[in-house]
Amino acid sequence: MPKKKKTIGEKMSDKKTKEDTRMIAQYFQEMIKYVEKYGNKTILLWQSGSFYEIYTIKDPDTDEFLLSEFNEYIKLTHMNIANKHIKYEYNGKKCSVFMAGFNNTDYLLEKWVKVLTDGGFTVPVWYEYKSVGKKKDRKLLQIFSPGCFFKNNKLESEDCNNIACYSILHSNGSLLKRTPSLLFGCANLNIYTGNLILFNHEVKRQNIHNPVVFDELERFNSIYNPQEIIFIHNYEDENKLQDVIKFSGINCSKIHYVNQSKEGEFTAQALNAENQIYQEDIMCKFYNIPDYDSYLKSSTLNERPIALKSLCFLLNFINDHNSKLTQKIHLPTFDNKSEHLHLANHSLNQLNIVDTAFSK
C-alpha cells in the first residue's frame, strides 16, 4: 500500500525540525499551528528587532515559494522580498529562507493588520517581550481577524464590526421515524458597540434542502452582515454545505467551517458548546449572573439551546483572539420575529428588496 503523502505541516514538523532551536524554526512551528487552526488564509507577523516580518522558503528545484500565503501577502502589501541567506531543511532539501516586513511602529502595525484582515486573513502577531544578550523571547500579542478588528472610521465601525457564529444542525428523522428537521442557532456580536444578538429557529419538512428553508437565516445574515463567521454544521456532503451558504446569502471575507461530525481543530469546542455545564461556565465567566438557572428561564435561553451553543462558542472564540473585546459586551437579546411578510426571500430579491448571494 503506497505511503500517504505528508502535508506541509507534517513535513515541517519532522524530528529534525523539532530539534532546530533557531528563531526561524520557532516561526515555522508556530505558523503551522495557526494555519491548522484557522485555515490557509493565515499570516503570522513576527517581531525581529525593529521590524515585523513574515518568512517563507523557496524550493531549490522549482524556484517556487512553498508557502502560498507569502505570495498573497506580497500582492496585498507590495513589499520587497529579501533573501535572509540562511537555510531551512524541508522535505530533505536545504531551502533558502526569504522574508518581507516593515518597521516596528504602532502606526505601521495597525496599517498592515487592517490591510491583511480586510483581505480576509487571520493575523497572529508575536512580539519581543524580553531580551537576554542575543536571545529574545517572544509571545503572542493578539490574533486579529476580519470580525475582531476595529475599523478606523467610527461611522463605518458601527455597521461593519460584526462577527457571528452560525450553528446549522440537521436531522434526517430516520432514528425516530419523524420528519427531517434543521436547527438554526446564531449569535452576532458588534465589537464596537458590544451589542450581542441571538437567533434560534427550527424547520421541519420533507424537502429540507430547499432555499425557502433558509429564509430566516438569510434575513438575519443580511441585517447584520458579519465580516467574519464561524459556521458550525454536521453536513457530510460538502456540496450541500455550499448550497446552504448560497441559500443563506452568506458572502463575507472570512468563514471558519467547523464540521462537528468530523475530527478537526474546533470540533471538541463545538461539541462542548452543547454541554450544559460548559455553557454555565462560559456564561458565568463573561457575565455577572448570580442565579444562572433563573437567568436561563427569564432570558428564554433554556428554550433556545442552539442559539446558546453559538453564543458560548463565539464568546470563547473572541476571547482567544482579543480578551478586551469580551469585557464590555452586553447581555444577549433575541432577534426572533413572529410577524414577517410571507414572501420568500428569493422573491424579495427579484423585487430588489433584499440583496443576497443569488444576485451577485
Which sequence ranges carry the predicted segments?
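Basic, polar low-complexity surface loops/patches
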Residues: 2-360
